[in-house]
Regions:
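Short, solvent-exposed loop/linker segments at the N-terminal edge
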Residues: 41-48, 136-143, 234-238
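A short beta-strand segment in extracellular, disulfide-stabilized domains
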Residues: 47-57, 142-152
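Interdomain boundary/hinge segments at the C-termini of tandem beta-sandwich modules
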Residues: 24-30, 119-125, 216-222
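Extracellular recognition modules
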Residues: 5-11, 100-106, 161, 196-202
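Solvent-exposed loop segments of extracellular immunoglobulin-like
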Residues: 58-69, 153-164
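Short, solvent-exposed loop/turn segments at the edges of extracellular beta-sandwich modules
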Residues: 11-17, 106-112, 202-209
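Proline-enriched interdomain boundary motifs that mark the N-terminal boundary
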Residues: 30-37, 125-132, 223-229
Length: 238
């Protein structure tokens, strides 16, 4: 590594003449290295993934880039991404699954190509909150079974908010103060009628939509009454 200067001296023995060439300068640089590697991400379907980016130092000339995609965690050079020839790349997230990305960087001046680390972009389905046992009928002054959900898909940490509603729909309800767990108990219901509840689940992962459950319905009915009572006493023959 360094700067080196060369010239040649030409002698003509017969005439005794001598001439020097001009000086030629050769600069030998450090080999190129990648200082910033691409970083993968977990993301919900159709979200905006983190931009993959590389930065380099050393080498000769202007670097050229080619990004590659693979379904395996290997340096598979058989699938270059068309048009992906910059130092950054925005991966697609329109298909569920794992895609591995890396970039090959080329330089001038006889420098060897270098490859980035492999970055995994894991695209998962949107979250779905499914109501468990969504329809119940109880007697007045009774208490419904605890509402629970099955949450599948999505990425990140969930937060919960339960709502009550006056109609059989999972929009436009009233948030229930303090009802921020993944389950909910109504407490004792002392009014006859039909009551509606649902939950909204928010995930802090990249690109995840709000997950809203189906409606939980509780039908509160009057306690049963006996229309015909047994005869209180009878006399019969032996």
């Amino acid at each position: 590594v360094g700067t080196f200067f060369y010239y040649v001296v030409i002698n003509q023995t017969a005439s005794g003449c001598e001439v020097n060439s001009e000086v030629s300068t050769i600069i030998i640089n450090e080999g190129p290295t990648i200082t910033t590697q691409p970083i993968g991400s977990d993301i919900c379907l159709d979200g905006t993934a983190n931009t993959l980016e590389v930065l380099t130092q050393n080498g000769v000339g202007t670097p050229t880039y080619q990004w590659y995609a693979s379904t395996t965690n290997t340096y598979d050079l058989t699938n270059p991404i068309a048009g992906a020839t910059n130092s950054t790349y925005d991966p697609a997230t329109d298909t569920v699954g794992e895609i591995f990305y890396f970039v090959v960087i080329s330089f001038e001046g006889g420098c060897s190509d270098i490859q980035s680390e492999i970055a995994l972009v894991n695209t998962v389905p949107e979250p779905i909150a499914t109501a468990v046992n969504p329809e119940q009928t109880i007697c007045i002054d009774g208490q419904a079974d605890t509402f629970t959900i099955d949450l599948v898909g999505g990425i990140g940490n969930p937060t919960y908010q339960w709502f009550s509603n006056t109609t059989n729909t999972n929009t436009g309800g009233t948030a229930i103060a303090g009802a921020t767990n993944n389950n909910y108990d109504t407490g004792v219901l002392s009014t006859i009628g039909v009551f509606y509840y649902y939950i909204e689940v928010t995930l802090d992962g990249i690109g995840c939509d709000l997950a809203i459950s189906d409606v939980f319905t509780v039908n509160v009915v009057q306690d049963p009454v006996i229309d015909t009572q047994p005869i209180d006493s009878q006399e019969i023959c032996q």
